[in-house]
C-alpha cells in the first residue's frame, strides 16, 4: 500500500525492511506564564489567536464548524485506495496552527532542536516522532495554560481544503503546486522557512509539502457512512500523517494523500502542526 513513499524517499535498507517501506527517513518562569495567558485570553472565541512562549509568537487560525466531503473527491486524480471512499464529515469549531511548528518554537519550549535541517530557525521542526510531539505539546500546555493538541485527521483535511471557504483545489490553496508547496521539484532537497509560499483560503501555510504533519488518529481505513467529529480507530499500532513533504512528488502532496508510521519513529521530512 505504501510503495508510493518508498519510491519517493531515500531509505536506509535495514530500517526500510523493519518498517515495511514506510516513508520516514531515519526518517519559562511563572511571570512568563502570566504574560502568555493574559496575551491570548484577550482574544475572543471565533477570532484567530496569538500566543507567545519565551519570546516566540505563533498564531492559531479559527476554523468555523462545517460539513465537507472527506477523501478523494473528483478533483483528486491519481488517488490511492486508502483515500476512498469519500464520505461526509461534520466538524465543530476548532483552531489550527497558521504554520507548521517551527524550530524556533520547538526550541523555546524544549530547549533543544532535533532537526536535520537546522540552518534557519523559521524552518519547520523535523526529526520528531509522534511521541516526541506529545511531549512537546504537554510542555507547551504547561507554559501557556492552554489545551494544544495534534489535529484529528478530519480536522487536518478540512483546514487543508480551506474550511467553509474551500475552492476545491487539488493542493492546499491552489491547483498550481509551485504556488503553495515545497516539494521534490522545487525544494532543493531541504525544508524551507514557513510562510514563503501562498496561504490557502483560511490563511494557513504549507499544508501541502515542506514536512509531513502528524495527526492524532490511529491509522485506519475510511467508511462510507457520514461521521461527526471523528477521531479515528480506538486502538492501533501506527499514527496518521498528512500533507507531503519537501521530498514528495506532486501527486503525493495532494490534500487527500495520507499515510502512517509507528509513533516512535522520526524522520527528516516529518513535523507537526498544532490544533485546539
Where are the regions a protein language model picked out?
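Sec-dependent bacterial lipoprotein signal peptides
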Residues: 1-25
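Bacterial Sec-dependent N-terminal signal peptides
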Residues: 20-51
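Hydrophobic alpha-helical segments, especially N-terminal targeting/anchoring helices
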Residues: 51, 205-208
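Short aromatic-cysteine micro-motif
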Residues: 55-57, 79-164, 185-205, 276
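Mature N-terminal segment immediately following signal peptide/propeptide cleavage
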Residues: 57-69
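Surface-exposed recognition segments
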Residues: 76-89, 164-165, 187-190, 211-276
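Feature responds to low-complexity, polar/acidic, surface-exposed segments characteristic
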Residues: 116-122, 171-173, 224
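Alpha-helical phosphate/pyrophosphate-handling elements in metalloenzyme active cores
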Residues: 180
Amino acid at each position: 500500500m505504501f510503495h508510493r513513499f518508498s519510491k519517493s524517499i531515500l531509505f536506509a535498507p535495514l530500517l526500510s525492511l523493519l518498517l515495511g517501506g514506510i516513508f520516514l527517513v531515519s526518517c519559562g518562569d511563572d511571570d512568563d506564564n502570566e504574560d502568555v495567558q493574559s496575551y491570548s485570553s484577550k482574544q475572543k472565541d471565533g477570532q484567530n489567536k496569538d500566543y507567545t512562549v519565551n519570546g516566540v509568537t505563533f498564531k492559531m487560525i479559527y476554523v468555523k464548524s462545517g460539513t465537507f466531503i472527506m477523501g478523494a473527491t473528483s478533483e483528486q486524480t491519481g488517488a490511492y485506495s486508502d483515500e476512498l471512499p469519500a464520505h461526509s464529515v461534520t466538524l465543530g469549531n476548532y483552531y489550527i496552527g497558521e504554520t507548521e511548528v517551527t524550530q524556533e518554537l520547538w526550541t523555546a519550549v524544549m530547549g533543544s532542536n532535533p532537526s536535520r535541517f537546522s540552518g534557519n530557525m523559521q524552518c519547520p521542526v523535523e526529526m520528531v516522532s509522534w511521541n516526541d510531539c506529545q511531549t512537546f505539546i504537554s510542555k507547551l500546555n504547561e507554559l501557556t495554560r492552554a489545551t494544544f493538541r495534534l489535529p484529528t485527521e478530519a480536522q487536518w483535511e478540512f483546514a487543508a481544503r480551506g474550511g467553509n471557504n474551500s475552492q476545491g483545489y487539488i493542493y492546499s490553496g491552489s491547483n498550481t503546486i509551485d504556488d503553495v508547496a515545497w516539494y521534490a521539484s522545487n525544494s532543493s532537497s531541504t525544508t524551507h522557512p514557513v510562510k514563503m509560499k501562498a496561504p490557502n483560503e483560511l490563511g494557513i501555510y504549507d499544508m501541502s509539502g515542506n514536512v509531513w504533519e502528524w495527526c492524532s488518529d490511529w491509522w485506519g481505513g475510511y467508511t462510507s457512512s457520514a461521521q461527526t467529529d471523528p477521531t479515528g480507530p480506538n486502538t492501533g499500532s501506527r499514527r496518521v500523517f498528512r500533507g507531503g513533504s519537501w521530498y514528495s512528488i506532486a501527486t503525493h502532496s495532494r490534500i487527500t494523500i495520507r499515510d502512517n508510521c509507528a509513533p516512535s519513529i522520526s524522520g527528516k521530512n516529518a513535523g507537526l502542526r498544532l490544533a485546539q
